[in-house]
């Protein structure tokens, strides 16, 4: 080892030290910074889309609950049927639009079928599926209730004959309020046509939501397709990954907890 004339070790010059540091830790290129920036931006967009989809599913869940309360009110003597049917139509139309938007956003952020799936995406799939199933069930209930009350009114008109005003008022307290029992025959026919139109519109919306439910099940990620309904309720908090077959050597059996 070379040494200085006074016995001290010769230190490397500044140029040598700078070259050593440059070799040991090269600076980041412009492409590396671009990749890092694009990755964080993509993650931010995905999280924002996930939050939007979560809000849509929650709002759709609220619309389903509101529609269910309206269906329960069918036949209540304290509720005016024309206003009730108008509110049901408004709530049903808004709920169908929310369901379509939620399905589109959820399908856009779900990613590849055999890749890693965020647990929140799995939860949104299950929530949207349950809401759609309940939504179509409530539509079917409203169709049955409106149809039965319509049939009850027509049967009463056919067999009633001429009745006094007092008897009509007395029966009105016990008859479901599909329409005003004191209305004229012309008003009765018009309201009967409106009820039939509402039933047809509800049947159309129900078919559309059933088709949307079928599309949702088709686009559902594979880890959710391969599980039954009971296992879907117990989701792991970790990302779900498609299971692949593995070989184990030297084991007679494998018991999974």
Swiss-Prot record:
Residue ranges, annotated region (Disordered): 1-45, 172-191
Biased composition, class Basic and acidic residues, residue ranges: 32-45
Domain notes: The nuclear localization signal is both required for nuclear localization and palmitoylation.
Post-translational modification (record): Palmitoylated. Undergoes rapid palmitoylation turnover. De novo and turnover palmitoylation are both mediated by ZDHHC2. Palmitoylation regulates the cell membrane and nuclear shuttling and the regulation of GPCR signaling. Upon depalmitoylation, it is targeted from the plasma membrane into the nucleus. GPCR signaling inhibits depalmitoylation and promotes localization to the plasma membrane.
Keyword Nucleus: yes
Organism: Rattus norvegicus
Gene assigned in the entry: Rgs7bp
Name of this chain's protein: Regulator of G-protein signaling 7-binding protein
Subunit structure, interactors included: Interacts with 'R7' family proteins RGS6, RGS7, RGS9 and RGS11. Component of some R7-Gbeta5 complex composed of some R7 protein (RGS6, RGS7, RGS9 or RGS11), Gbeta5 (GNB5) and RGS7BP.
């Amino acid at each position: 080892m070379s040494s200085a004339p006074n016995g001290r070790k010769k230190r490397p010059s500044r140029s040598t030290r700078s070259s050593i540091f440059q070799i040991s830790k090269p600076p980041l290129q412009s492409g590396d910074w671009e990749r890092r920036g694009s990755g964080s931006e993509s993650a931010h967009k995905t999280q924002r889309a996930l939050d939007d989809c979560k809000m849509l599913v929650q709002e759709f869940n609220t619309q389903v609950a509101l529609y269910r309360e309206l269906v329960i009110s069918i036949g209540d003597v304290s509720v005016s049927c024309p206003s009730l049917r108008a509110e049901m139509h408004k709530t049903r139309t808004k709920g169908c639009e929310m369901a379509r938007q939620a399905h589109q956003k959820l399908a856009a952020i779900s990613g590849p079928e055999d890749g890693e799936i965020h647990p929140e995406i799995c939860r949104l799939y299950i929530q949207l599926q349950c809401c759609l199933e309940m939504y179509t069930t409530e539509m079917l209930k409203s169709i049955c209730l409106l149809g039965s009350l319509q049939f009850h009114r027509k049967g009463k008109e056919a067999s009633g004959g001429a009745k006094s005003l007092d008897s009509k008022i007395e029966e009105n307290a016990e008859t479901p309020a599909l329409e005003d029992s004191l209305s004229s025959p012309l008003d009765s026919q018009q309201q009967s046509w409106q009820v039939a139109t509402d039933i047809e519109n509800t049947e159309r919306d129900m078919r559309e939501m059933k088709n949307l439910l079928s599309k949702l099940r088709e686009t559902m990620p594979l880890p959710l397709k391969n599980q039954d309904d009971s296992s879907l309720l117990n989701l792991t908090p970790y990302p779900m990954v498609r299971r692949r077959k593995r070989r184990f050597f030297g084991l007679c059996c494998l018991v999974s907890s």
